[in-house]
């Protein structure tokens, strides 16, 4: 009997939710032969979909690197060719070095601003890792806001269903300005404590951030303004995620719907400047970006103030006269970053390797993996995929590497939107995403955040101070999974965290 991809995924998700005893039974069953892989979108591989706990995969397939420490997120895919490694190094240079205000003698790197959040990509994605919110618990040690941005919009839909920017401050609140240009204002945070208990009586305290846009330099904000804080995530494995066949992601949604439970993931569809069409969203906290190329070019503009061919206009609004009057750093192409440089940065981000798992055979980690499946975490955090063709074949090899195709990977995500409940809701739609929905983030590399970034702040705004706090913030579709974890013993909670941190 021939099974559709949706039914195959549905069956896998049911198996993922079984008890440890049931999972052991599945593991003992004969492995099914992989189905033939048609190009460009291979059908789901039954051997992967029915994989049971206790069978660890290299997170990035042949791209995986064995690394820990400060540089664990900064290494090229292990299977890159020599010429590709040269491009990786060039892209890394432009990702990490600061841009300067124009005009300057360093014409290859001038054009910063007029408004900006950081002077480089690496200013937010430090060591290619995750940013953290400023620590306002210590007023004697102020910290910059680099890495945390505030999206802005008002009700309605713009072109292609995009959010409508605030008429004065645009679609992003930029606190910094170059010499002679005022920053847009200050972003302030305070925290409210949320108390709770596990079923065994152990108390816990969460911290809920409350935001304020203050010291506004261009007049009042719209009275019906909607805001959404977003923290900069780690950027490992992006090219592999981009190579997951769209059919697999849509099969995830179909399978979840077929199960009839509370988990019902939805795809987002967004406008992509490189594809020049509506495409499936894969990146961003609301799956509001379809490609690494679009994300990179739009971040250069929005976060650093650097124009490119597909984003040639600054974000200054009519009310921001000093911003409009500021000089630019345009080069021969009439923009501030040439395509060849931008392509190298895109290639760099596409080929950053996921690091290998640690302690995968530890008994506590294996126990935690069984609990992860028992709590049905794997229904959203789908463990494995087989990558397919690149997203933009016509632009190859400028933006990608052939070594990213045909890889068996373990990112632990379905790349779908889920209603995460009132506590995490921002109330701000983003294309097809509602104000209660967030994309399932990949879990690979999460245990190395303390090594790379000296913290483990998680979720879309960095409010969670570790894995267990992140789980406790889950609501909406994930409420049942959260409540299962609340019922776990202290030993089981520790094992669950150890498993997630081994990824």
Predicted segments — roles?
Residues 1-8:
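Bacterial N-terminal signal peptides that target proteins for export
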Residues 8-16:
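Bacterial N-terminal signal peptides
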Residues 18-503:
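Periplasmic c-type cytochrome electron-transfer domains
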